[in-house]
């Protein structure tokens, strides 16, 4: 599927201005360029174009609210100055798996003042001597490079994977507290009924046990009285024999 058709599909009857997250992974770009994406997507905060055969991002529209951009597994080798102009508020950028060979290609990213996380996995530039040290010097605003900070401490998942989560699910979350999704309609009160029935069974069981214990006690008393009666009878018989 080409990129234009994929964008149309992802809109799902929404207007471009309403879209905050757009995932175009694995579709086909035309001649290695972005197409179908316009500045009408003014509310876009997260854009993913992984493995779409991009070789240029020159056609990227003005996206002032864009915070995270996924460009991994493409054929990009330069032209990154466009990002500072079109996406000035970018905080997360993933360029892993592209044809970036030297630090000079990355230098235009200095103008991205809010850039916090940059990924360059599987790019030739990572093979340079003192790559990490030099890149942190080149981009002092960076907190994380390839998932680790300057002290080689791993980024929290929220930064390593990106901060955007459930941007288009706000409406779905509104009623979550009002009902239990795992309970089918009409069965919400069944658990309470089962508990009440269980309590009633326990009470009746206890009453039966008390009745059994009472009957056993009465039987024991009867046995004792019978024994005493027999003893008294024997005593009387013995007395009669003595009188004779």
Curated annotation (Swiss-Prot):
<dbReference type="GO" id="GO:0005737">
    <property type="term" value="C:cytoplasm"/>
</dbReference>
<keyword id="KW-0539">Nucleus</keyword>
<keyword id="KW-0677">Repeat</keyword>
<feature type="compositionally biased region" description="Acidic residues">
    <location>
        <begin position="157"/>
        <end position="227"/>
    </location>
</feature>
<dbReference type="InterPro" id="IPR001611">
    <property type="entry name" value="Leu-rich_rpt"/>
</dbReference>
<dbReference type="GO" id="GO:0006913">
    <property type="term" value="P:nucleocytoplasmic transport"/>
</dbReference>
<feature type="region of interest" description="Disordered">
    <location>
        <begin position="148"/>
        <end position="244"/>
    </location>
</feature>
<keyword id="KW-0256">Endoplasmic reticulum</keyword>
<comment type="similarity">
    <text>Belongs to the ANP32 family.</text>
</comment>
<dbReference type="GO" id="GO:0042981">
    <property type="term" value="P:regulation of apoptotic process"/>
</dbReference>
<dbReference type="InterPro" id="IPR032675">
    <property type="entry name" value="LRR_dom_sf"/>
</dbReference>
<keyword id="KW-0597">Phosphoprotein</keyword>
<comment type="function">
    <text>Implicated in a number of cellular processes, including proliferation, differentiation, caspase-dependent and caspase-independent apoptosis, suppression of transformation (tumor suppressor), inhibition of protein phosphatase 2A, regulation of mRNA trafficking and stability, and inhibition of acetyltransferases as part of the INHAT (inhibitor of histone acetyltransferases) complex.</text>
</comment>
<dbReference type="GO" id="GO:0042393">
    <property type="term" value="F:histone binding"/>
</dbReference>
<feature type="repeat" description="LRR 1">
    <location>
        <begin position="18"/>
        <end position="41"/>
    </location>
</feature>
<keyword id="KW-0963">Cytoplasm</keyword>
<feature type="domain" description="LRRCT">
    <location>
        <begin position="123"/>
        <end position="161"/>
    </location>
</feature>
<keyword id="KW-0433">Leucine-rich repeat</keyword>
<dbReference type="GO" id="GO:0048471">
    <property type="term" value="C:perinuclear region of cytoplasm"/>
</dbReference>
<protein>
    <recommendedName>
        <fullName>Acidic leucine-rich nuclear phosphoprotein 32 family member A</fullName>
    </recommendedName>
</protein>
<feature type="repeat" description="LRR 3">
    <location>
        <begin position="65"/>
        <end position="87"/>
    </location>
</feature>
<dbReference type="GO" id="GO:0005634">
    <property type="term" value="C:nucleus"/>
</dbReference>
<dbReference type="GO" id="GO:0005783">
    <property type="term" value="C:endoplasmic reticulum"/>
</dbReference>
<dbReference type="InterPro" id="IPR045081">
    <property type="entry name" value="AN32"/>
</dbReference>
<dbReference type="Pfam" id="PF14580">
    <property type="entry name" value="LRR_9"/>
</dbReference>
<feature type="repeat" description="LRR 2">
    <location>
        <begin position="43"/>
        <end position="64"/>
    </location>
</feature>
<feature type="repeat" description="LRR 4">
    <location>
        <begin position="89"/>
        <end position="110"/>
    </location>
</feature>
């Amino acid at each position: 599927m080409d990129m234009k058709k994929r964008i149309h599909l992802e809109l799902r009857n929404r207007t471009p201005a309403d879209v905050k997250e757009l995932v175009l992974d694995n579709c086909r770009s035309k001649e290695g360029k972005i197409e179908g994406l316009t500045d009408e997507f003014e509310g876009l905060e997260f854009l993913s174009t992984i493995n779409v055969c991009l070789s240029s991002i020159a056609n990227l529209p003005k996206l002032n609210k864009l915070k995270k951009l996924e460009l991994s597994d493409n054929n990009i080798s330069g032209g990154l100055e466009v990002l500072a102009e079109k996406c000035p508020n970018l905080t997360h950028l993933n360029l892993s798996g592209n044809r970036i060979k030297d630090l000079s290609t990355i230098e235009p990213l200095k103008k991205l003042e809010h850039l916090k996380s940059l990924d360059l996995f599987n790019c030739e530039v990572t093979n340079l001597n003192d790559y990490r040290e030099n890149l942190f010097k080149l981009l002092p605003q960076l907190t994380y490079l390839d998932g680790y900070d300057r002290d080689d401490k791993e980024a929290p998942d929220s930064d390593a994977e990106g901060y955007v989560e459930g941007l288009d699910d706000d409406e779905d979350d509104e009623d979550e507290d009002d009902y239990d999704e795992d309970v089918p309609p009409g069965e919400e009160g069944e658990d309470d009924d089962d508990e009440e029935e269980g309590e009633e069974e326990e009470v009746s069981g206890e009453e039966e046990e008390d009745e059994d214990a009472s009957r056993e006690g009465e039987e024991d008393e009867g046995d004792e009285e019978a024994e005493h009666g027999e003893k008294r009878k024997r005593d009387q018989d013995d007395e009669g024999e003595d009188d004779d």
